[in-house]
């Protein structure tokens, strides 16, 4: 009963707040990314991130190939990682043909400019050094396509919804780090949990399970960690952002920003939290991005769903290294927009 | 009214000459167009049309379209689905969209008045607009995400409530003068969807069936200068005409199964429709299918040309027609992996 009351209060307050949220004016240049070679095209631009030099990394879906091996069905390829200079000019491809690029989900850059890809098809998180050389994997690519009804981890291992106590992912979505370099992975679609590992990739703990209670998740689609080490989880299906301390203890939740597909916390002395209420791919509803204080206070919003410049087609990742210059990777519009905010 | 009398007349002719259908199987009898004694239009096929580089092959010639410069675009099924551009002399220029996420199983290619190139992919469930430089500028629909489990395929058949922005094996695309976009959708959803020029849903028509306004495989589509939409309702063996708001206007059902329709440009527009030799390669069909009809927009049949076969000038499952110039037709074929350019010589020219 208490839970229902809380939900009603969120809805009520959300409805009231929605009407009061100021619009933030902004600009966008489309197309921003340019001079791609004739044989390289963006597909669904699932991931976008910048490094400290302002270079832009795009992790995009390009289409997998399948082969039959005896009674098993193997898939290969399907994603590309591309680097652009700060003006949007194509520089190079990284990781071409690598074993773990199957179905791009996100790309993030850590404080040392290492590049991390999260692949929802290969169930692997890959760490590259700043020049694109391979450093480390988390998780393992399934040897072949899983049979139906498998359990929580890769190849059906573990408890459905909770997985195993280790880096054995089933459709992970995002990666983030605290100041000490500890790694957090949202393991989202089949499991519904957050996995914490140390900076060398050694398993520390896991929390969460599928559900709508505090500390539970229904598609944790995006995560971010603030300077204090608090972990913000975009709990997409439950239409809320849950906040945990560095050990995974529930702290609070924000429930009035729609369905958070992509969240980002800007660096610097005053950190902001961005969250995209992305339109589902089969609709043009919603689409606005919220700018918030870390305590959940909404400062403003901008954008709407659509296919033109300054409109969004299912934003799947936001980069906010510079808080008033965002990059948004879109699934259905196959592009990245550079957004300059004028708050 | 005039047209109805003609239809009755052709039925009478059919009954009066029973010899004509004597050796035909029931399937072949059904495949034959009702319209009979249609005048033949003289034509020839241009030999050695497309010049391909070594190790580039056409597969099933699923789509063909020309732009305002006469360049020829061919959308073909190969190891991967591929889109090629040739100049007006058939010289190979380039491949467009190599390795594209939305190229899975080709169905149609069309070029709009601004020379943007639109590919309709029935495997990716997408319609993809390229600018004339060959870069993607807009997409409609969405490629399904890969399944985790081969043992659990998605349920067959149409979705109970097809989404505004998702397709199920779409087949064709067209535009009215205002730039509104029409998509025939298709094998799964049996409907036509209208979007504004920016891809925002406006309206749709159709469900599976044989009543007016229903479809049994809307396989091909063309839009005239007034915004009327001609839908090749293939398995119902009729062309359905709708106004720009997708209200049903007329039905033309005497030209066989419309595998491919095209409306030519210019002040006097013509409607072409191919009663194609079916892709089942049933030889009994070959004597009663394969011809292409030339019509006025009101459905009056002006003539026909072609027959099923593999020789130059014969047609092996025409899948798309380009008729930018109504006397220079391009056709792409399924069974024989090629594109032909057909020079028509209608009487009085």
For each feature predicted by the language model, list its residue ranges:
Chain A
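Eukaryotic scaffold repeat domains enriched in small/polar residues
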Residues: 20-343
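Bacterial N-terminal signal peptides
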Residues: 6-16
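Positively charged n-region of N-terminal signal peptides that target proteins for export
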Residues: 1-4
């Amino acid at each position: 009963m208490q839970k229902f009351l809380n939900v009603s209060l969120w809805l009520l307050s959300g409805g009231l707040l929605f009407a009061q949220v100021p619009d933030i004016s902004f600009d966008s240049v489309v197309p921003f990314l340019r001079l791609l070679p004739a044989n390289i095209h963006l597909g669904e631009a699932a991931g976008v991130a910048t490094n400290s030099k302002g270079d832009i990394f795009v992790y995009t879906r390009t289409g997998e190939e399948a082969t039959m091996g005896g009674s098993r069905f193997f898939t290969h390829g399907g994603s590309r990682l591309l680097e652009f200079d700060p003006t949007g000019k194509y520089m190079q491809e990284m990781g071409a043909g690598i074993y773990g690029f199957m179905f791009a989900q996100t790309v993030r850059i850590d404080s040392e400019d290492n590049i991390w890809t999260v692949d929802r098809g290969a169930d692997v998180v890959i760490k590259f050094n700043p020049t694109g050389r391979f450093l480390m994997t988390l998780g393992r690519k399934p040897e072949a396509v899983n049979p139906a009804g498998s359990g929580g981890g890769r190849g059906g291992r573990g408890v459905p919804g909770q997985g195993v106590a280790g880096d054995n992912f089933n459709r992970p979505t995002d990666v983030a780090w605290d100041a000490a370099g500890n790694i957090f992975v949202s393991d989202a679609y089949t499991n519904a949990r957050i996995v914490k590992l140390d900076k060398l990739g050694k398993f520390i703990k896991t929390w969460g399970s599928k559900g709508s209670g505090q500390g539970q998740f229904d598609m944790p689609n995006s995560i971010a960690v603030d300077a204090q080490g608090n972990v913000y989880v975009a709990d997409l299906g439950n239409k809320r952002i849950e906040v945990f301390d560095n050990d995974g203890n529930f702290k609070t939740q924000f429930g009035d920003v729609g369905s958070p597909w992509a969240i980002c916390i800007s660096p610097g002395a005053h950190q902001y939290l961005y969250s995209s209420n992305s339109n589902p791919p089969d609709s043009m509803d919603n689409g606005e991005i919220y700018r918030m204080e870390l305590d959940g206070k909404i400062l403003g919003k901008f954008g709407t769903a659509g296919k033109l410049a300054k409109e969004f087609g299912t934003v799947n990742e936001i980069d906010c290294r510079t808080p008033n210059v965002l990059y948004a990777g879109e699934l259905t519009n196959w592009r990245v927009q550079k957004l300059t905010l004028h708050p | 009214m005039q047209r109805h009398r003609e239809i009755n007349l052709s039925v009478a002719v059919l009954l009066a000459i029973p010899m004509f259908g004597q050796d035909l199987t029931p399937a072949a009898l059904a495949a034959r167009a009702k319209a009979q004694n249609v005048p033949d239009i003289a034509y020839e096929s241009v030999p050695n049309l497309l010049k391909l580089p070594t190790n580039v092959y056409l597969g099933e010639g699923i789509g063909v379209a020309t732009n305002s410069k006469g360049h020829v675009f061919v959308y073909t099924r190969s190891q991967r689905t591929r889109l090629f551009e040739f100049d007006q002399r058939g010289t190979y220029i380039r491949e467009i969209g190599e390795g594209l996420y939305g190229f899975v199983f080709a169905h149609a290619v069309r070029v709009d008045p601004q020379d943007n190139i639109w590919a309709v992919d029935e495997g990716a469930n997408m319609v993809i607009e390229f600018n004339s430089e060959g870069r993607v500028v807009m997409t409609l629909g969405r490629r399904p995400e890969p399944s985790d489990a081969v043992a659990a395929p998605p349920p067959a058949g149409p979705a109970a409530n097809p989404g505004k922005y998702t397709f199920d094996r779409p087949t064709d695309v067209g535009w009215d003068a205002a730039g509104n976009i029409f998509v025939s959708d298709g094998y799964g959803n049996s409907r036509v969807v209208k979007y504004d020029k920016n891809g925002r849903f406006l309206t749709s028509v159709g469900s599976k069936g044989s009543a007016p306004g229903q479809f049994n495989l809307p396989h091909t589509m063309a839009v005239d200068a007034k915004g009327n939409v001609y839908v090749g309702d293939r398995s119902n063996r009729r062309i359905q005409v709708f106004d720009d708001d997708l209200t049903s206007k007329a039905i033309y059902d005497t030209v066989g199964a419309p595998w491919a329709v095209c409306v030519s440009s210019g002040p006097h527009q013509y409607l072409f429709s191919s009663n194609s030799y079916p892709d089942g390669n049933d030889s009994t069909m070959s004597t009663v299918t394969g011809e292409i009809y030339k019509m006025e927009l009101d459905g009056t049949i002006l003539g026909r040309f072609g027959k099923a076969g593999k020789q130059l000038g014969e047609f092996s499952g025409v899948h798309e027609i380009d008729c930018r110039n109504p006397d220079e037709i391009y056709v792409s074929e399924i069974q024989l992996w090629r594109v032909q350019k057909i020079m028509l010589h209608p009487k009085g020219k």
